[in-house]
Amino acid sequence: MSEQKAFSLNVDEQNIAWLAIDVPNEKMNTLQAAFADEMKEIFAQLKDSSGIKGMIIHSLKPDNFVAGADVRMLEACTTANEAQALAKQGQELFQQLSDLPYPVVAAIHGPCLGGGLELALACDYRVCTDFDKTRLGLPEVQLGLLPGSGGTQRLPRLIGLLPSLDLILTGKQLRAKKAKKLGVVDACVPDTILLDVAKQFIDKGKNKGKKKQSTKEKLMSGSGLGRKLVFEQAAKKTNQKTRGNYPATVAILEVIQHGLEKGFAQGQELEAKRFGELVMSSESKALRSIFFATTEMKKEHGTDAQPAAVKKVGVLGGGLMGAGISHVTVAKAKVPVRIKDVSNDGVLNALNYNYKLFEKQRKRRILSKADLQAKMLQLSGGVDFTSYNHIDVVIEAVFEDLDLKQQMVADIEANAKSETIFATNTSSLPIHKIAEKAERPENIVGLHYFSPVEKMPLVEVIPHETTSDETISTVVALAKKQGKTPIVVKDKAGFYVNRILAPYMNEAAHILLANEPIEKLDGALLDFGFPVGPITLLDEVGVDIGAKIMPILVNELGERFKGPDVFDILLNDGRKGRKSGKGFYTYKGKKKEVDKSIYKLLKLTPESKLSDNDIALRCVLPMLNEAVRCLDDGIIRSPRDGDIGAIFGIGFPPFLGGPFRYMDQFGLKELVEKMNEFASKYGDRYAPCDGLLTRAGEGRTFY
């Protein structure tokens, strides 16, 4: 039996060559180094075939073109030179494609990303479908890399410098119509006529006219001076976002500029060189580990039980969390939702919240007016339990009050089916206590979302001791359909994310009360790689929420969670954070600035004494210590889950790979030494936990 191949070539009676891509035993087409020999065979066949009029490259997969290069092959590289050789191999193959003497058309249906788009860019024309899953982009930067098979050179020459920089530096993915508008593709058509339209492009011949440039593009990148300005501005803007933590962005700018100034061949040469270096960088290795972890997690259900089908969801509470949960259920999971609130106003607020989010998508032409109406028809609500006897999963998002949540359990058990799952979105109450009076405790589980629900990618799934395996697997499957990455955590105070966040926030308060200025404190953690500083985070979450959660953690987990007494002082002065217009900062619209009167209120005289690095480490080390305790206490199932939880739940710097990967990189022995040094200076709260001491002493790592 002959071995299945990823590429097959046929020439039809019209002398059009059809190159079909179908990677065997894989759901998605990805490009692999092992395919190089196949491609060489294809080129040899093409050379031997006379009279070919043109070639169309298409996929035999039902819903994807090429999702990118197979990232796994980078893990086999032990040196930058090996990775550079991979890039060069890709460049050479695509150059051969580009050099064919007849027109080549890429017929794209579904994702066309990374190496897939680089393949398409090497063709003369690109035609794509208007299918919802058709996406085009070069997302390599999100793995700490740059496009290594000609993407940095071909895209700017096709669509111009300004839009190319935006696409390559962000890794954003374009929908089909936007790709057509930018000139990435030449046509966007229904999938039923994709191949017919591709054939029409063969008749246009090999030499395609250059894309017409906008006046702005001509002015900004048409001259050496304009280009210099563009690159300076792009570097400045990018550095403001990355704060120097992502070397790939610097390399991208350098390689594109080099190619435009020195020519295509030299541009490709530097592209391959920088690609090789980036593959071996700690930042890319960390970002790739996140990619592998999330890919693994997509295949897991939390237990071995099969998830039950979820055809309708109920949401209790029409507040911010309830509205967000209902939105991801309808928009992403495509499951209808019934919202129950104590007042009609609450239901209307949730419906209005959803309408505004869908309307934003309509304005961006992601949804049509008919799509918007269809989505809104999937949402209904009321003040009673009408139709709750048809609901499979109820997600409770009411006020954080134990009696109220227990009452919700009783109401659902009285009004829903016996197998209906009750998932509580509590952030601080133990799940076993919410389930204490339940008739069917096996149906009760924690499902902790993060705010704003439609943006935050993590959800914590918290079974209590008698939660059934089917309940766990069903809510894990639902969370994934909602576009979330779920981690299963143990039912203990703070669960995982809030438990590791608390010591970090407490330490920020200690530093503030030692007179460090607020902007210095926040800036140090931004430079470390967090998306927002700890003081800003407290304002965003709400000082009142912090005041509620901290005492619970102290009560359940001990004095190490006791922070400085600042909450009452702030709340008595009406400072709840952004939602009340002032906290540590004052807020006017989207603008915020440090409220200088806070220093007087807290009897402080701001004066910068600590280095940025010391501030960052003082906040981060207690978080790392607590993460190890969570692993050893069984709160999280693995270092992998702990890393993903911290990155997706609180924005731990992705380029560090998460708390556990960062500790391995830091060195556990060195980490223990640093903690002991801080413990002698600032107190026992820095003393390394037993798990850290043991691992450091035995020379072990987490991975």
From Swiss-Prot:
<keyword id="KW-0456">Lyase</keyword>
<dbReference type="InterPro" id="IPR036291">
    <property type="entry name" value="NAD(P)-bd_dom_sf"/>
</dbReference>
<dbReference type="InterPro" id="IPR008927">
    <property type="entry name" value="6-PGluconate_DH-like_C_sf"/>
</dbReference>
<comment type="subunit">
    <text>Heterotetramer of two alpha chains (FadJ) and two beta chains (FadI).</text>
</comment>
<feature type="region of interest" description="3-hydroxyacyl-CoA dehydrogenase">
    <location>
        <begin position="308"/>
        <end position="703"/>
    </location>
</feature>
<feature type="site" description="Important for catalytic activity">
    <location>
        <position position="140"/>
    </location>
</feature>
<dbReference type="InterPro" id="IPR029045">
    <property type="entry name" value="ClpP/crotonase-like_dom_sf"/>
</dbReference>
<dbReference type="InterPro" id="IPR050136">
    <property type="entry name" value="FA_oxidation_alpha_subunit"/>
</dbReference>
<dbReference type="Pfam" id="PF02737">
    <property type="entry name" value="3HCDH_N"/>
</dbReference>
<comment type="similarity">
    <text>In the N-terminal section; belongs to the enoyl-CoA hydratase/isomerase family.</text>
</comment>
<keyword id="KW-0963">Cytoplasm</keyword>
<feature type="site" description="Important for catalytic activity">
    <location>
        <position position="118"/>
    </location>
</feature>
<dbReference type="InterPro" id="IPR012802">
    <property type="entry name" value="FadJ"/>
</dbReference>
<keyword id="KW-0443">Lipid metabolism</keyword>
<dbReference type="Pfam" id="PF00725">
    <property type="entry name" value="3HCDH"/>
</dbReference>
<dbReference type="Pfam" id="PF00378">
    <property type="entry name" value="ECH_1"/>
</dbReference>
<dbReference type="GO" id="GO:0016509">
    <property type="term" value="F:long-chain-3-hydroxyacyl-CoA dehydrogenase activity"/>
</dbReference>
<dbReference type="InterPro" id="IPR006176">
    <property type="entry name" value="3-OHacyl-CoA_DH_NAD-bd"/>
</dbReference>
<comment type="pathway">
    <text>Lipid metabolism; fatty acid beta-oxidation.</text>
</comment>
<protein>
    <recommendedName>
        <fullName>Fatty acid oxidation complex subunit alpha</fullName>
        <ecNumber>4.2.1.17</ecNumber>
        <ecNumber>5.1.2.3</ecNumber>
        <ecNumber>1.1.1.35</ecNumber>
    </recommendedName>
</protein>
<keyword id="KW-0560">Oxidoreductase</keyword>
<dbReference type="GO" id="GO:0070403">
    <property type="term" value="F:NAD+ binding"/>
</dbReference>
<dbReference type="GO" id="GO:0004300">
    <property type="term" value="F:enoyl-CoA hydratase activity"/>
</dbReference>
<dbReference type="InterPro" id="IPR018376">
    <property type="entry name" value="Enoyl-CoA_hyd/isom_CS"/>
</dbReference>
<comment type="function">
    <text>Catalyzes the formation of a hydroxyacyl-CoA by addition of water on enoyl-CoA. Also exhibits 3-hydroxyacyl-CoA epimerase and 3-hydroxyacyl-CoA dehydrogenase activities.</text>
</comment>
<dbReference type="GO" id="GO:0008692">
    <property type="term" value="F:3-hydroxybutyryl-CoA epimerase activity"/>
</dbReference>
<dbReference type="InterPro" id="IPR006180">
    <property type="entry name" value="3-OHacyl-CoA_DH_CS"/>
</dbReference>
<keyword id="KW-0520">NAD</keyword>
<dbReference type="InterPro" id="IPR006108">
    <property type="entry name" value="3HC_DH_C"/>
</dbReference>
<keyword id="KW-0276">Fatty acid metabolism</keyword>
<dbReference type="GO" id="GO:0006635">
    <property type="term" value="P:fatty acid beta-oxidation"/>
</dbReference>
<feature type="region of interest" description="Enoyl-CoA hydratase">
    <location>
        <begin position="1"/>
        <end position="190"/>
    </location>
</feature>
<comment type="similarity">
    <text>In the central section; belongs to the 3-hydroxyacyl-CoA dehydrogenase family.</text>
</comment>
<dbReference type="GO" id="GO:0005737">
    <property type="term" value="C:cytoplasm"/>
</dbReference>
<keyword id="KW-0442">Lipid degradation</keyword>
<keyword id="KW-0413">Isomerase</keyword>
<dbReference type="InterPro" id="IPR001753">
    <property type="entry name" value="Enoyl-CoA_hydra/iso"/>
</dbReference>
<keyword id="KW-0511">Multifunctional enzyme</keyword>
